[in-house]
Amino acid sequence: MRQQDAPKPTPAACRCSGLARRVLTIAFALLILGLMTWAYAAGVPLASDRYGLLAFGLYGAFLSAHLVAQSLFAYLEHRRVAAAARGPLDAATARSVALTISAYQEDPAYLRQCLASARALLYPRARLRVLMVVDGNRAEDLYMVDMFREVFADEDPATYVWDGNYHQPWEPAAAGAVGAGAYREVEAEDPGRLAVEALVRTRRCVCVAQRWGGKREVMYTAFKALGDSVDYVQVCDSDTRLDPMALLELVRVLDEDPRVGAVGGDVRILNPLDSWVSFLSSLRYWVAFNVERACQSYFHCVSCISGPLGLYRNNLLQQFLEAWYNQKFLGTHCTFGDDRHLTNRMLSMGYATKYTSRSRCYSETPSSFLRWLSQQTRWSKSYFREWLYNALWWHRHHAWMTYEAVVSGLFPFFVAATVLRLFYAGRPWALLWVLLCVQGVALAKAAFAAWLRGCLRMVLLSLYAPLYMCGLLPAKFLALVTMNQSGWGTSGRRKLAANYVPLLPLALWALLLLGGLVRSVAHEARADWSGPSRAAEAYHLAAGAGAYVGYWVAMLTLYWVGVRRLCRRRTGGYRVQV
């Protein structure tokens, strides 16, 4: 029998196959959940000294194996990307692409860099469109329209200030009419929408300022106005500086494999030397993309195509555009987590999502702790919400997607439980031992990142662990209980508003830990330290405290000598006046 004559599976067979995959996926997820919970709760020791002070348990072994596997697959993905052939792009057959930029109260310096980098993209001009949509049409928002017109002055740019948006109710009578009396004629459709679509589909460089509606409304306008006029759609934020090769490398990934529906690039920090927060964020970003997402890309299931740099197949995007925009959670319309839900919609269709380190951009990150905390809280909200949606489609992708989702979803809860248990029921050495293990694992992960990147400064990533434990961890629990509250969060940079709500869980967390610490110290002060086991514990406590202090002295010295000096000089960084 010839291959083309092979019988196709019947719909019933497809349904049975899909059901079987669902059952197996659920069983696998429950297995991972059960094993992790049992390993954590049972506390099975694998190795220990005679007094049980230096112990290594099954749960620790599981997490260590997870980090090793993740690092290995990330390395293999980088090897695969580096070995891939990269021939020149044929301008005659290049896919048509629309670069969409979402803008909201952007700092003028960042916006100018973004637009200039869009002009400098190495992609056939005839196959590339640039569309910026501004969230706001008031007088104070129009400086972004003027800047777009200025930067693209030689490209015959088109600009339009729209009184409404796609979801603003339009009244024909309010739009004006022709004639009088019984022969009065009114517009049948919103003339603003028609004008926007006509400009977007006929001009190469277009900027639209529309009625405020949030970032998702802005992105919807760009996607809807484009329709099916292009092959691929690139998303970008207005604080992002694109590498000249960024778009070309993304296009190559989609061109190489029709099963890939979306691809993301390497997002780096534009202002790493503004503060210690932005510096640690720059290191964390690199690991998040080049280790964690590179690992996911090895299995074709990247969980989030980041907003500053992503490319989607337009024919697929248009299929779920309305469902994406109208997403609701607990009865509330979702206005954040746009990028993660776009990725989830693509995954729900069974298409792969990829990451390539060859495509790169630079994006602004908060330099103040409070604004960083607000950003992380907002991102955590979308993570938990999208985790639930993502679970519906685990069966359509590699088992790694299920495994990693379960592990990463449970991790914050296990960390919080461990910390509280040690502070309230543990002895001083047990608490110090866990802190040493946490920093040891963080240092090992940072050392691998330093080797993979070829940059010794990456070892300072281990300083991010306390920031996670003391700041990000309580923020995640605030996000969990406020998932249905929405807003732009940290996206507007021209006018920064302080939001002190994320400090509340930090204060509660600090009080909980302080209470546990006081209780443990009071209990240990009454204990008898004369026995051999207590003497050994005192010795380990002194040695461990010395090692812990020595570690911090070394890391902080490296930071102050190698980084903080550069922060003062702002070498290689970007200082933006707000």
Swiss-Prot record:
It catalyses: [hyaluronan](n) + UDP-N-acetyl-alpha-D-glucosamine = N-acetyl-beta-D-glucosaminyl-(1->4)-[hyaluronan](n) + UDP + H(+); N-acetyl-beta-D-glucosaminyl-(1->4)-[hyaluronan](n) + UDP-alpha-D-glucuronate = [hyaluronan](n+1) + UDP + H(+). The gene is HAS1. GO terms for molecular function: hyaluronan synthase activity; identical protein binding. GO terms for cellular component: Golgi apparatus; plasma membrane. The keyword Transmembrane helix applies. Pathway: Glycan biosynthesis; hyaluronan biosynthesis. Belongs to the NodC/HAS family. GO terms for biological process: cell adhesion; cellular response to platelet-derived growth factor stimulus; extracellular matrix assembly; glycosaminoglycan biosynthetic process; hyaluronan biosynthetic process; negative regulation of fibroblast migration; polysaccharide biosynthetic process. It comes from the Eukaryota. Its main location: membrane. Its EC number is 2.4.1.212. This is Hyaluronan synthase 1. Residues 1-25, 74-399, 452-457, 519-540 are cytoplasmic. Its cofactor is Mg(2+). It is found in: Membrane. Pfam families: Glyco_tranf_2_3 (PF13641). The chain crosses the membrane at residues 26-46, 53-73, 400-420, 431-451, 458-478, 498-518, 541-561. Keywords: Glycosyltransferase, Membrane, Transferase, Transmembrane, Transmembrane helix. It is a multi-pass membrane protein. Catalyzes the addition of GlcNAc or GlcUA monosaccharides to the nascent hyaluronan polymer. Therefore, it is essential to hyaluronan synthesis a major component of most extracellular matrices that has a structural role in tissues architectures and regulates cell adhesion, migration and differentiation. This is one of the isozymes catalyzing that reaction. Also able to catalyze the synthesis of chito-oligosaccharide depending on the substrate. Signal peptide: none annotated. Residues 47-52, 421-430, 479-497, 562-578 are extracellular. SUPFAM superfamilies: Nucleotide-diphospho-sugar transferases. Widely expressed. Highly expressed in ovary followed by spleen, thymus, prostate, testes and large intestine. Weakly expressed in small intestine.
